[in-house]
């Protein structure tokens, strides 16, 4: 998406980009990261992974893992083995369009239903699997809304959730409603305005790569091992 189109859409949702923001840096986020993973939806129940990671990308990001998801996936696979963890991005009805950020829950109802369906699949396909989740920007709002809306029996199977640039951080008091705070890790950079109730995109919103390569997956790995043991 070109910078002009992006700023026009943001203006339509009562948001604006700082004029000092570098065009190329913004486009690197919006156009980069085209990885798609559908291990859960394509997987066979006879060969379930012990761990299933469900992730929602940020607005306009390509693939279903966007820019941050692949880094988390790589670290999880190093910890649990390629066959030990399934990676599943949220696609389908989740279009990651900019306008949906202005909706009451920070994303569309259709997107929430899509992610809810992914959380529900393992209940029949891989009932013994441990679930972990994450999301970036609009995807963080989507992950939070989906986890909040789950039946408690399925929600209790989620060992941990990581949220980057959480667009509902202020509104939800830095947590996911109806979900334990100790199983939630929110990454909000200093100066990331979306974490303080705005939809203005500033440079700190685009610099969560180091967190996705280190602290975020490490948190998830720790939470999984607390449930399943260190094996």
Swiss-Prot record:
Site (Transition state stabilizer): 59, 138
Protein's organism: Fusarium vanettenii (Neocosmospora pisi)
InterPro entries: AB_hydrolase_fold, Cutinase/axe, CUTINASE_1, CUTINASE_2, Cutinase_monf
Protein name listed in UniProt: Cutinase 3
Stated role: Catalyzes the hydrolysis of complex carboxylic polyesters found in the cell wall of plants. Degrades cutin, a macromolecule that forms the structure of the plant cuticle. Allows pathogenic fungi to penetrate through the cuticular barrier into the host plant during the initial stage of fungal infection.
Statement: the UniProt record of this protein carries the keyword Transferase: no
Pfam families documented for this protein: Cutinase
EC number: 3.1.1.74
Keywords: Disulfide bond, Hydrolase, Secreted, Serine esterase, Signal, Virulence
